[in-house]
């Protein structure tokens, strides 16, 4: 199963990052075959580390600013939702991008689990 791990860049802090990484390990579905990432700092990088340590392929969707301008991160989030079969969202309670992605999952019928950190 293609699992997207999304969340705020606020998880760069070492202590918070270690907690978030542990939560990835606890919440990732057992049948995960690929990790999907947005390529940003924070939770996206932790997702890529998890994939490398568990020998899982990674699909990274980077925002295309040349094509979409300031909408690039939102378009990237939509691409992630369209590609993923399951989304694991780490939310800090304030990230608008994560909230948007969770709402997109619900709208598109993509299973999503929100983990508050």
Model-derived regions: residue spans:
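Acidic/glycine-enriched connector segments
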Residues: 2, 10-117
């Amino acid at each position: 199963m293609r699992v997207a791990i999304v969340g705020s860049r606020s998880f760069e802090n070492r202590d918070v990052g270690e907690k978030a990484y542990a939560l990835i390990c606890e919440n990732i579905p057992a049948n995960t075959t690929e990790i999907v990432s947005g390529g940003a700092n924070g939770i996206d990088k932790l997702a890529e580390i998890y994939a490398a340590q568990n020998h899982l392929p990674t699909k990274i969707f980077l925002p295309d600013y040349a094509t979409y301008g300031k909408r690039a991160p939102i378009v990237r989030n939509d691409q992630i939702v369209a590609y993923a079969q399951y989304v694991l969202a780490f939310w800090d309670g304030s990230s608008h991008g994560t909230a948007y992605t969770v709402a997109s999952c619900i709208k598109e019928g993509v299973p999503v689990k929100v983990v508050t950190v």
